[in-house]
């Protein structure tokens, strides 16, 4: 069996990793061994943070909805409960958008929730 020299393959593999590590500080962008570890760690962070992004946005929407609901004399949980009872199907993302950009529409929804709660 002939001997395989790794010149082309190794160069391609190294180049692929070093390209991904472009912009990293110091040895992390220049030395293959260090760059490979940095790229693997970056991929782990990216995977984890794609999951966290969903949680963080939901938390942000809830904070915004709560702030707007309190301007109308409701807490977040009572607003959501009232909207459910009034069978208003609107998700938190769009509710937060209304709370920030269309206060009049949000006010109408808050009134609907109050009526459904009997208040």
From Swiss-Prot:
Protein name in UniProt: Large ribosomal subunit protein bL20
Q: Which UniProt keywords apply?
A: Ribonucleoprotein, Ribosomal protein, RNA-binding, rRNA-binding
Gene3D superfamilies per the UniProt record, alphabetical: 6.10.160.10, Ribosomal protein L20
One short Pfam name that applies is Ribosomal_L20
Q: Name one GO biological process term.
A: translation
| Superkingdom of the organism of origin | Bacteria
- PROSITE patterns cross-referenced by the UniProt entry: RIBOSOMAL_L20
Stored NCBIfam families: rplT_bact (TIGR01032)
């Amino acid at each position: 069996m002939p001997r395989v020299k790794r010149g082309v393959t190794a160069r391609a593999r190294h180049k692929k990793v070093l390209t991904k590590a472009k912009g990293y500080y110091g040895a992390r962008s220049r030395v293959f061994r260090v760059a490979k570890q940095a790229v693997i760690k970056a991929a782990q962070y990216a995977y984890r943070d794609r999951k966290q992004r969903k949680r963080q946005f939901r938390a942000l929407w809830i904070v915004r909805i709560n702030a707007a609901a309190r301007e109308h004399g409701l807490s977040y949980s009572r607003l959501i409960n009232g909207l459910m009872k009034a069978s208003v199907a609107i998700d938190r993302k769009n509710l937060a958008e209304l709370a920030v950009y269309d206060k009049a529409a949000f006010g109408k929804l808050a009134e609907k929730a109050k009526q459904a709660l009997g208040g």
